[in-house]
Amino acid sequence: MATAEVLNIGRKLYEGKTKEVYELLDSPGRVLLQSKDQITAGNAARKNHLEGKAAISNKITSCIFQLLQEAGIKTAFTKKCGETAFIAPQCEMIPIEWVCRRIATGSFLKRNPGVKEGYRFYPPKVEMFFKDDANNDPQWSEEQLIAAKFCFAGLVIGQTEVDIMSHATQAIFEILEKSWLPQNCTLVDMKIEFGVDVTTKEIVLADVIDNDSWRLWPSGDRSQQKDKQSYRDLKEVTPEGLQMVKKNFEWVADRVELLLKSNSQCRVVVLMGSTSDLGHCEKIKKACGNFGIPCELRVTSAHKGPDETLRIKAEYEGDGIPTVFVAVAGRSNGLGPVMSGNTAYPVISCPPITADWGAQDVWSSLRLPSGIGCSTILSPEGSAQFAAQIFGLNNHLVWAKLRASKLNTWISLKQADKKIRECNL
């Protein structure tokens, strides 16, 4: 039986309404976030002890942060530690709650009279609120946040940092929204916080994402809400009311682990005309691995052994696993068009173009007879990405990696631009 980890816990760094943060003496740059058995509403104007809430909240946060980390979102989460706590990189918190909304409800309707409940935002609407309990967390504009000239862990919060947090908020919401859909749950809105990692000086998703952080409606039906709004809506807090709230929280905790899996299988099969193309194919396989997609390599020639090519095709069609075929053949590419003409599965041609005859060879992948729907992508990484986009339509884990990759590319460009501008000053 595994021995429970013994932590050398230091001083309390912070205490909030529902959690405490402690330093870890043996792990500089790491902290312990300990959840409480407490539920609050209205900036703690209403608060109650709720036995078991700490474990529920910790489970939800740990699963959600794991999901986001595996997708590629930078997150202040190291690992779950016991039932009610987790270890995370130490951050200096930015005192802004970022809210992302798909459906208009709650406080948005009060602040925007005339908007009807249920109005849908395309894209999701991002708002920010300054954390100030005494003033009920007032809504802030982008300009107010920049004018505040906050500095955390040596990082000044300017236009670049605000843009990064805004884009990250939308991406995180969309990943979680997509992840809840297979459970027939609508993510209505969500609030998150960011911090600056004291070690890396990077902005990361921090704090927690638990059942206090969102509105979650099974079947898109508000009357079935399973989030903290069920506690806010209690006219009077009674033991029976708290038990109902706890059951709602347990309902979410029971399902959140399912977000880490997908019921939709996927597979890429790379067909190469010759082992001389193996290096090209290995790049495709590696890129597929980055999206969590299993990839198999096979050798077959549609010119020299069409019967074997079609036998291999039938082998993969016969096991019921959704498959994208990638054909890798230089010179005269018969492999991609022959496969495409004989299967209803998607086929991508990814010819290894060479400098000498490449300009001529590529036409065998581009000029095709009618009835052939074979796409052509020259980049090995690009062909894997296109396969991922096909699978991402029905696999939220693949889609999450694609969405996080898009965000991270945008952030890297934004940071590169900031660095260049600073060099020019």
From Swiss-Prot:
CDD domains: SAICAR_synt_Ade5. GO terms for biological process: 'de novo' AMP biosynthetic process; 'de novo' IMP biosynthetic process; 'de novo' XMP biosynthetic process; G1/S transition of mitotic cell cycle; GMP biosynthetic process; purine nucleobase biosynthetic process. Bifunctional phosphoribosylaminoimidazole carboxylase and phosphoribosylaminoimidazole succinocarboxamide synthetase catalyzing two reactions of the de novo purine biosynthetic pathway. The modification Phosphothreonine is found at T238. GO terms for molecular function: ATP binding; identical protein binding; phosphoribosylaminoimidazole carboxylase activity; phosphoribosylaminoimidazolesuccinocarboxamide synthase activity. InterPro entries: PurE_classII, PurE_dom, SAICAR_synt/ADE2_N, SAICAR_synthetase, SAICAR_synthetase_CS. Residues 2-260 are annotated as: SAICAR synthetase domain. CO2 binds at S332. It comes from Rattus norvegicus. The lineage of its organism: Eukaryota, Metazoa, Chordata, Craniata, Vertebrata. The modification N6-acetyllysine is found at K36, K247. Pathway: Purine metabolism; IMP biosynthesis via de novo pathway; 5-amino-1-(5-phospho-D-ribosyl)imidazole-4-carboxamide from 5-amino-1-(5-phospho-D-ribosyl)imidazole-4-carboxylate: step 1/2; Purine metabolism; IMP biosynthesis via de novo pathway; 5-amino-1-(5-phospho-D-ribosyl)imidazole-4-carboxylate from 5-amino-1-(5-phospho-D-ribosyl)imidazole (carboxylase route): step 1/1. This is Bifunctional phosphoribosylaminoimidazole carboxylase/phosphoribosylaminoimidazole succinocarboxamide synthetase. In the N-terminal section; belongs to the SAICAR synthetase family. In the C-terminal section; belongs to the AIR carboxylase family. Class II subfamily. It catalyses: 5-amino-1-(5-phospho-D-ribosyl)imidazole-4-carboxylate + L-aspartate + ATP = (2S)-2-[5-amino-1-(5-phospho-beta-D-ribosyl)imidazole-4-carboxamido]succinate + ADP + phosphate + 2 H(+); 5-amino-1-(5-phospho-D-ribosyl)imidazole-4-carboxylate + H(+) = 5-amino-1-(5-phospho-beta-D-ribosyl)imidazole + CO2. The modification N-acetylalanine is found at A2. The modification Phosphotyrosine is found at Y22. Keywords: Acetylation, ATP-binding, Decarboxylase, Ligase, Lyase, Multifunctional enzyme, Nucleotide-binding, Phosphoprotein, Purine biosynthesis. It comes from the Eukaryota. SUPFAM superfamilies: N5-CAIR mutase (phosphoribosylaminoimidazole carboxylase, PurE) (SSF52255), SAICAR synthase-like (SSF56104). Its EC number is 4.1.1.21, 6.3.2.6. The modification Phosphoserine is found at S27, S107, S274. Residues 261-266 are annotated as: Linker. Residues 267-425 are annotated as: AIR carboxylase domain. Homooctamer. One of its GO terms (cellular component) is cytoplasm. The keyword Nucleotide-binding applies.
